[in-house]
């Protein structure tokens, strides 16, 4: 039986009423309907949908809860990377940030900033298509996150359908998922009453609740989503400033911070910081600092980005919390490059929202500066509310049996000699790959997402491979088979097969990734990319002199020395030969007469691509010397437009710019051999 017009009208009326009261409750914090009356509306809507299941839509208020539990989280690639923010920890650093960006864009001291609290929660991205929630993802590694769509749908402050006018066809909204202090206390009290494990702090509670495979568990947790930024926007326009955009998001149905402010000049930013720091404890949620963003989007675009963060924003972190505890012992850990680091073993202490039992002591110089001994009472601080460190000792509490900390004269793992290098505070194991610790760390680095991206090769598996002498260097990974891997602890035949497939897939890589994966000291991702683009082949990098290396962007004498030293070692060259013999392949980069073929051009990517991701397309264009921008202007050389291209394509057509579809892009890349 089809639903009558009266039923359809009633259905829409109930949806609108419930959405209205949801906004009052979750976004405005101003409910005007008793819970019992709200429940009646909800039950009435449920009854109609049960009678006419064909009328149930994804954006119905009843669909926030009820999805079936998942076996695991799928991955979602962000259309635009979710970058982190750089931090400052004092006013001097904040003022230096302001001067740096004003000098870059020639702005006066009244530069306008948007100011808002930095929530201590979990970053998430919501993607809306035609005003309806399509997908939701965690930040992940900034490029790929976990699909948490069903869990985010259960959060009352997440609109399933946007309201208002001028909603873009595609809109990505980014924000923080957090658990209010009152909700955190309540769920811990409930857990204690049931003799269940409690959460350490609201952030952990939010993370644990958001990553439940069963959305019905997430639905019972008091989570809140607060929007703080936008990502991809297609088929629509945003206001000209960040602050106005937050206001627009509020009008579309999102919760945004009531504490946001506009500051004219860095002095007003400083005043806002002190204002919110004083108010911090009275807020309903945890914050760990303030975020300042250049307000005007056109200035943000001029400032651009560094490798991992925007130049136009900074997080001013609150002073870390400190606590007293006792140093029980010191252990020495060996890192990938052989650096031997002292780690303090502490009497567990609750500080900064977590229980701390270990802290870094950095190196011998730091231990001497502190004058610290085993048995001392120490002050522990969580620097930036993240990394525990010992900042001082309480000498008056030193016991008579306190003992000096003695650094090892031999590697604590392999027994090799240790060396002190002039100008360095660290001591290093000379064992190289003879040292199991260095072998393990080098293999973990090689397999990491930013390097060879071998999915499933976790730390514990690497430890077993080295301990069982199945792998001696990174090239040995490509000799592993399913029976060998299936014999490892907690790794069955199916997981072993998946891992072998991932290892096989990693054989096709790029020159910059293999340079980074090799683990050359001080060669990070950006330096590896610069080396690749400058020399174009691995052989040329391997044979380069220090003088030639110093000509590369951002490569100084120290890095040049490490690169030369790495390739001077016969065992490293042998590993590279073994990788090539195993079928690992990285194409050379073509460069004509020393000039990259697309140097001086600016490309813009919009819409979706089928044969490669937008990040892959961006990497390939940059490898050819092109600049890849996020917006279209008269200076744009070409716009690459895939399905779903919106306002950027329209603007390109209006400006008469060159436009390529995916076929044209692939032809361009093939022409230049990438």
Curated annotation (Swiss-Prot):
UniProt KW keywords: DNA damage, DNA repair, DNA replication, Ligase, Magnesium, Manganese, Metal-binding, NAD, Zinc
Binding positions (Zn(2+)): 411, 414, 429, 435
Catalytic activity: NAD(+) + (deoxyribonucleotide)n-3'-hydroxyl + 5'-phospho-(deoxyribonucleotide)m = (deoxyribonucleotide)n+m + AMP + beta-nicotinamide D-nucleotide
Active-site residues, Swiss-Prot/TrEMBL: 118 (n6-amp-lysine intermediate)
MF terms in GO: DNA binding; DNA ligase (NAD+) activity; metal ion binding
Cofactor (UniProt): Mg(2+); Mn(2+)
Sites where the protein binds NAD(+): 35-39, 84-85, 116, 139, 176, 293, 317
Record-level GO cellular component terms: cytosol
EC number: 6.5.1.2
Stretches assigned to the BRCT domain: 593-674
Protein family according to the UniProt entry: Belongs to the NAD-dependent DNA ligase family. LigA subfamily.
NCBIfam families per record: dnlj (TIGR00575), PRK07956.1 (NF005932)
Protein's recorded name: DNA ligase
Organism, scientific name: Saccharophagus degradans (strain 2-40 / ATCC 43961 / DSM 17024)
Taxon lineage: Bacteria, Pseudomonadati, Pseudomonadota, Gammaproteobacteria, Cellvibrionales
């Amino acid at each position: 039986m089809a639903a009558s017009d009266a039923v359809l009208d009633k259905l829409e009326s109930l949806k609108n009423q419930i959405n209205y009261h949801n906004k009052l409750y979750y976004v405005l914090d101003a409910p005007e309907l008793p819970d019992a009356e709200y429940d009646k509306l909800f039950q009435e809507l449920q009854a109609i949908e049960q009678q006419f299941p064909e009328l149930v839509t994804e954006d119905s208020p009843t669909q926030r809860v009820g999805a079936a539990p998942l076996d695991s989280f799928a991955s979602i690639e962000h259309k635009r990377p979710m970058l982190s923010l750089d931090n400052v920890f004092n006013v001097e650093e904040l003022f230096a940030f302001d001067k740096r960006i004003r000098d870059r864009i020639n702005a006066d001291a009244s530069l306008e900033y948007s100011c808002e609290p930095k929530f201590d929660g979990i970053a998430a991205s919501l993607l809306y298509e035609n005003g309806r929630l399509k997908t939701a993802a965690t930040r992940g590694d900034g490029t790929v996150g976990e699909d948490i769509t069903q869990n985010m749908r259960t959060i009352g402050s997440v609109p399933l359908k946007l309201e208002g006018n001028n909603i873009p066809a595609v809109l990505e909204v980014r924000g923080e998922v957090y658990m209010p202090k009152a909700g955190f206390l309540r769920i811990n009290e409930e857990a204690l009453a049931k003799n269940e494990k409690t959460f350490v702090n609201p952030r952990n509670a939010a993370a644990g609740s958001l990553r439940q495979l069963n959305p019905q568990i997430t639905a019972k947790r008091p989570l809140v989503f607060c929007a703080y930024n936008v990502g991809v926007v297609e088929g629509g326009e945003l206001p000209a400033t960040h602050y106005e955009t937050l206001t627009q998001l509020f009008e579309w149905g999102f919760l945004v911070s009531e504490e946001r402010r506009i500051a004219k000049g860095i002095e007003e930013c400083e005043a806002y910081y002190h204002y919110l720091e004083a108010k911090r404890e009275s807020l309903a949620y945890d914050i760990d600092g303030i975020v300042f963003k250049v307000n005007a989007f056109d200035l943000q675009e001029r400032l651009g980005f560094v490798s991992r963060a925007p130049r136009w924003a900074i997080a001013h972190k609150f002073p870390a919390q400190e606590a007293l505890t006792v140093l029980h012992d010191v252990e020495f850990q060996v890192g990938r490059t052989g650096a031997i680091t002292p780690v303090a073993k502490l009497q567990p202490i609750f500080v900064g929202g977590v229980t701390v039992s270990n802290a870094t002591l950095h190196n011998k110089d730091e231990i001497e500066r502190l004058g610290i001994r085993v048995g001392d009472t120490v002050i522990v601080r969580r620097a930036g509310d993240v990394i525990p460190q010992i900042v001082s000792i309480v000498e008056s509490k030193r016991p008579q049996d306190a003992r000096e900390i003695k650094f090892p004269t031999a590697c604590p793992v392999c027994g090799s000699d240790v060396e002190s290098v002039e100008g360095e505070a660290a001591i290093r194991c000379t064992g190289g790959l003879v040292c199991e610790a260095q072998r393990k760390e080098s293999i973990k680095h090689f397999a990491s997402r930013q390097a060879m991206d071998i999915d499933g090769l976790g730390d514990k598996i690497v430890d077993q491979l080295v301990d069982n002498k199945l792998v001696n260097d990174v090239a040995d990974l490509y000799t592993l088979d399913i029976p060998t891997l299936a014999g490892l602890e907690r790794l069955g035949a199916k997981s072993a097969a998946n891992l072998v497939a991932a290892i096989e897939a990693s054989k096709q890589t790029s020159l910059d990734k293999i340079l980074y994966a090799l683990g050359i000291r001080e060669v990070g991702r950006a330096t590896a990319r610069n080396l690749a683009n400058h020399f174009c082949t691995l052989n040329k990098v391997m044979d380069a002199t220090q003088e030639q290396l110093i000509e590369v962007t951002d490569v100084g004498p120290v890095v040049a020395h490490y690169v030369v030293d790495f390739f001077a070692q016969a065992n490293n060259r042998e590993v590279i030969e073994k990788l090539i013999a195993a079928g690992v392949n990285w194409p050379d980069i073509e460069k004509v007469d020393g000039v990259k073929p697309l140097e001086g051009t600016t490309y813009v990517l919009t819409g979706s691509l089928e044969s490669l991701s937008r990040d892959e397309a961006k990497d390939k264009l940059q490898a050819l010397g092109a600049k890849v921008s996020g917006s279209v202007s008269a200076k744009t050389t070409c716009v690459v437009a895939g399905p779903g291209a919106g306002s950027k394509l329209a603007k390109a057509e209006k400006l008469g710019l060159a436009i390529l579809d995916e076929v044209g892009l692939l032809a361009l890349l093939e022409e230049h051999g990438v």
